[in-house]
Amino acid sequence: MERTIRVTGKGNLSVKPDTVRLVMTMEGMKEEYDAALEESAHMTEYLKQMFSDLGFDCEDIKTLNFHVSAEYESYQAKDKSWKRRFEGYKYVHRMKIEFPADNKRLGKVLYKLGHSPVRPEFRIEYTVAEPEKCKNELLANAVTDAKAKADVLSKASGVSLGEIITIDYSWAEIDFVSRPMDKLMLEECCMRSCEPDEAYDIDINPDDIDVIDNVTVVWGIK
């Protein structure tokens, strides 16, 4: 039976976010299904035009999720029984747009959103432009750590490492995201406006994004 050593390496990586991700949600309710679709399409078109006026490409806005559902309200009838009545068709459209981190440009975007009749709910996230490159570096760090631990253990045990037999990696999704602003901070930020430039005075310096991942490597020993 082949002798083996199994070691789990931990990879650590700290990356500076370089991209703003704006996640926007628009929702509303209409009595008719077609009316709900029409209003959603109208609001989306308005939003795309707004970003186009700011120098973005309409294709930069990506849909994350869109659905229309029938909404009902529960109520108690005169006979004390509980029943449901139809309220309307509710649409929810979640979108995102990403652009290089730039407080001045972000301030202009937030100003336009704050003065738009559409007024979608939104949150600001910071991420990286090349997540795959960061994931590969993180994975390499984990393998390097596993090898260093295996070297220590094999030398202490008086054996030497052979060939790698297996490498086990979870392939879990790693989200490189920093959310430096909560809702209250965002509202305070948006109160500091600069009317002549039609932009909010945004001063955000997001912290580095710290991520950890593990890799388990099995070596033969001799």
Question: Model-found features: residue ranges?
Answer:
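Short, charge-dense linear interaction motifs
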Residues: 1-222
